Amino acid sequence: MPTQAVVIGVDSSTQSAKAAFIEVATGRVLAVGRAAHEVSGAGGARESDPEAWWGALREAVAYGLKESGVPASSVTGIAVAGQQHGLVVLDGSGSPVRPAMLWNDTRSAPQAAALTGELGGPGAWTGRTGSVPVASLTATKWRWLREHEPRAAEAAAAVRLPHDFLTERLAGVAVTDPGDASGTGWYSTKTGAYDPELLDLIGLDAGLLPTVAPTGGTRAGSLTAAAADALGLPAGIAVAAGTGDNMAAAVGLGLGGGGLLDHPVLSLGTSGTVFAATRARPVSPALSGFAAADGTYLPLACTLNCTLAVDRIAALLGLSRDTAEAGGEVVLLPYLDGERTPDLPEASGSLIGLRHTTSRQQILGAAYEGAVVTVLRALDEVLRACGLDPAGPEVSARPLRLVGGGARGRHWVETVRRLSGRPLLIPPTAEPVAVGAAALAAGASTGNDPVELARAWQSAVGGTVELPPVERDTATWSRVSAAIDRAASG
């Protein structure tokens, strides 16, 4: 039974909670508890009950305690990384006024377009926040709520992000971090604070918002007696400020000021995401210029349709996902839930180039290709935001770190390798978000740099898979990219 200090990193994602129990001294993952929660909504709506997140967190921690054999007295800290952008509206008792509007809720697309123009266009927004409003940003959801459900907006005593809500349940304090705050549309990456003019623009009182901690690894407070009783953990252990899921993944992979800078990562999950940690503040309208959890920055591009969309195509075709073949002449853009990058909230899936000889396996392969090209197109923009020339020989040969559920899928890996032409590194952990959250918890409990801790854990654990580059499939790239350009131009 472990006797060394243990921390818990919670990944509260779109559909589940995971709680990773990690030895601080070694980085050894002792157990990962899991619990599901539901997402509801039809059309463009995607909502979830924040109380279900709290229930799933409790269940995941209980499972992890049981499976790891860790005595509760060994746990010294906990931190939450949550799905970004969600709008959580609370009443005076801290209970949700309504279900949370999630990151992939696209109903606020008209509000995003209106807000972009009201401030003076994309450049005005990136100059302040690093990002142009799209339907995923929290500010657009608040504007939508005020227009469509004014009573709910008027009832708000507090406005939180998903991870803020859970951190407050743990520590009893209202706190967020620069990383997750930078995905709201009302936090300025230029000033490092909430932007009063933007809050006025959307009609949001700053008094409803949490305090912004210096970093995600800052100790926000201590586990309250009520939370300790609910979780079976000691009261008084460190609770870190926590961060958003993408920022936590960067920490878990050792990206940041205390680790790797300007090295790209591709995450294949419900969404497809490409990002890198850098010291340069990103201001490109082509991507989201987020702050990172450690005081650096995280230029990031995210697509709405990745593994879940391809799984749906496989189900429609009656195929196993591993039976896919290269798409041949067919192009399938799996934009089943609209799309964020490019910004096409009303888009639907499209199938182009069918022939008599086209097989179901090729159609499925084309879905993989459509999803991968969509997210890889943003890779060059991320590298430029880091101040790099994507075509430079050293930069173009820089390995691409592949994480997320898709990194465990043979055809996902083969498709990324073929269409990127880059060497791939697949880290051993399947849970970089939870590991990153655990590193933040360790930082809060020890005072050490979370990124440095995560790097040390990686070195101790080992097991990274290295795949050399293959010749890039430029024909497929050009064919799919042209279809994306046509979709984006209307």
Language-model regions, residue ranges each:
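Short, glycine/charge-rich flexible loops or terminal/linker lids adjacent to PRPP-binding catalytic cores
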Residues: 105, 220-224
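Short, conserved phosphate/pyrophosphate- and ester-handling motifs at nucleotide-, phospho-/glycolipid
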Residues: 49, 105, 245
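Short beta-strand-loop/turn "lid" adjacent to the catalytic site in phosphate-handling enzymes
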Residues: 66-103, 131-136, 167-188, 211-216
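N-terminal glycine/serine-rich phosphate-binding loop of ATP-dependent small-molecule kinases
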Residues: 1-98, 127, 228-229, 233-241, ...
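Active-site core segments that coordinate phosphate-bearing ligands/cofactors
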Residues: 8-10, 109, 116-129, 136-139, ...
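Gly-rich Lys/Arg/Thr-decorated short loops/hinges at beta-loop-alpha junctions or inter-strand turns
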Residues: 37-47, 124-125, 175-182, 205-208, ...
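Short acidic-aromatic active-site loops that bind/stabilize oxyanions
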Residues: 46-54, 131, 213, 217, ...
